[in-house]
Amino acid sequence: MNKTRCCVDVAFTLLIHRHVNMSFAIAAPTRATFHTQVKSRASPRTRVGCTAGLFDGFGRGGSKKAKDDVLRLAETQRRGVGHSPEDRAEMEAAVDALIASRGKGGRANTDRNVLTADWRLAWTSENETLFLLEKFPGGVDGAPLTQAYQRIDVESGTLSNEVVFCNGTDFVVNSVIEVVDDVRVSFQFTAAALNLAEPVEASVPLPPFGRGWFDNVYVDKDMRVARDSRGDTLVVVRD
């Protein structure tokens, strides 16, 4: 597939799905539809599991074995792409074990120095992100893999979700965030754009998609696990 065709396909697909909430694991609580508005309701902090990793060597903080198990599953399950209910259950169990085993270094934390970072997706249960990773995987003929990132700056109160496709095109959803307590972060989308790479070189603005919250249920120096207002789980590693 040449660059022009890849750009056009990405643009077409994202425009068709522009009402899809593309924030890996931070979307409105209602899962049956992808509407902008969020119905007000109680938001219990239920644990719906997730995982982590894509690279070896992240073994400090909390139980090394529990963390390694999460990272291994994340890699085996290809970041969650095409995962089965059984895969999800296995990952959830591994994450629960990680949370239960966490030591002082793996406590949930929204501290600025801990949360502020560029985080690369290791595993997610969030369907919209997985759709993009499956539709445009990259990694063919020497091309890089499509990657997803969460870029957080607590001091400036911003969060950016970004999917970078194999040809350099990226899809970005920007949000403002507020730290609610030592675990929970609320967010509201402010803007979204599809930035096409060469030879198209164009930016297609898209509407923002609502608001929600996520809980950081595990954080250490190189990995973070979050569970959100839609019941999804996200595992990211520090980039």
Task: Report the location of each language-model feature.
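Generic detector of short, well-ordered, non-transmembrane alpha-helical segments enriched
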Residues: R18, T46-V48, L115, D220
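Generic recognition of cysteine residues
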Residues: C6-C7, C50, C166
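N-terminal chloroplast transit peptides
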Residues: M1-A42
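Soluble ligand-binding/transfer domains with enclosed cavities or grooves
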Residues: G53-D239
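A short, compositionally biased N-terminal segment around positions ~18-40 that is enriched
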Residues: K39-V48, A89-A93
